């Protein structure tokens, strides 16, 4: 999927209860917000930088959202079990948007 540069603000998150999700930075680095399974607060939000050529796997139940990038656009590979985006996807959101700095 193509990831475009956008403001570093997040509020919505998704999780998959039965499926891991792997994200691989193909043409440039990506930043991904993560939070522990269950209820979480903005203080428990973590942003990880994944450099070009590297990837990260998200265990079932871990909250995450679409990648961000420092570049104009990059390509990112997203890998999960077939039909996960229809059959094993749950959403939550924080009360207010949260910004992050590098």
Language-model features, listed with the residues they occupy:
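Conserved metal-binding segment of the jelly-roll/cupin
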Residues: 49-68
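Short, surface-exposed ligand- or partner-binding patches at beta-edge/loop junctions that are enriched
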Residues: 74-75
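Non-catalytic, conserved peripheral segments adjacent to functional cores
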Residues: 1-47, 71, 80, 85-88, ...
């Amino acid at each position: 999927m193509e990831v475009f540069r956008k403001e570093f603000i997040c509020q919505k998150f998704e999780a998959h209860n039965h499926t891991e999700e792997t994200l691989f930075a193909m043409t440039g680095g990506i930043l991904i917000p993560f939070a522990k399974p269950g209820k979480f607060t903005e203080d428990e939000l973590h942003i990880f930088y994944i450099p070009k050529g590297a990837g990260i796997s998200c265990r079932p139940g871990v909250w995450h959202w679409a990648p961000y990038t420092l570049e104009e656009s990059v390509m990112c590979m997203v890998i999960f079990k077939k039909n996960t985006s229809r059959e094993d996807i749950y959403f939550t959101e924080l009360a207010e948007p949260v910004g992050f700095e590098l």
